[in-house]
């Protein structure tokens, strides 16, 4: 085993099984690419991204940990979000929540 190596079983692994999800259409209205990481509170993503922010409160991208989605300028794409777990308190990011959801 190599330090940091992750060993998994063969086959497919379902991420976030049974957790509430939400599908949103996102448009990058800015002139620069925007990248959002797997555990970023999507509600607080870059203001150049146009989407239903109220619906996205308490959600993050439903993608593998450590990955990200890139939105090119002028691009519109549909993404799936998954509800935040744990104590459902959000601190940092853009400072729009700073406490329990």
UniProtKB/Swiss-Prot annotation:
Main EC class the enzyme belongs to: hydrolase
One term under GO cellular component: urease complex
Keyword field contains Cytoplasm: yes
Keyword entries, A-Z: Cytoplasm, Hydrolase
Biological process terms in GO annotation: urea catabolic process
Database matches in Pfam families: Urease_beta
Entry superkingdom: Bacteria
Catalytic reaction list: urea + 2 H2O + H(+) = hydrogencarbonate + 2 NH4(+)
InterPro entries: Urease_beta-like, Urease_betasu_sf, Urease_subunit
One GO MF term: urease activity
EC number from the UniProt entry: 3.5.1.5
Subcellular location(s) per record: Cytoplasm
Main location: cytoplasm
Pathways per UniProt: Nitrogen metabolism; urea degradation; CO(2) and NH(3) from urea (urease route): step 1/1
Keyword Hydrolase: yes
SUBUNIT field: Heterotrimer of UreA (gamma), UreB (beta) and UreC (alpha) subunits. Three heterotrimers associate to form the active enzyme.
Sequence similarity: Belongs to the urease beta subunit family.
Record-given protein name: Urease subunit beta
């Amino acid at each position: 085993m190599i330090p940091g190596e992750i060993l998994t079983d063969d086959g497919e692994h379902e991420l976030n099984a049974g957790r509430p999800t939400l599908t949103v259409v996102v448009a990058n209205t800015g002139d620069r690419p925007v990248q959002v990481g797997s555990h970023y509170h999507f509600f607080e993503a870059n203001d150049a991204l146009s989407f239903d922010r109220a619906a996205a409160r308490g959600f993050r991208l439903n993608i593998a940990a450590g990955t990200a989605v890139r939105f090119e300028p002028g691009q519109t794409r549909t993404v799936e979000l998954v509800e935040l777990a744990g104590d459902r308190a959000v601190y940092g990011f853009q400072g729009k929540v700073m406490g329990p959801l």
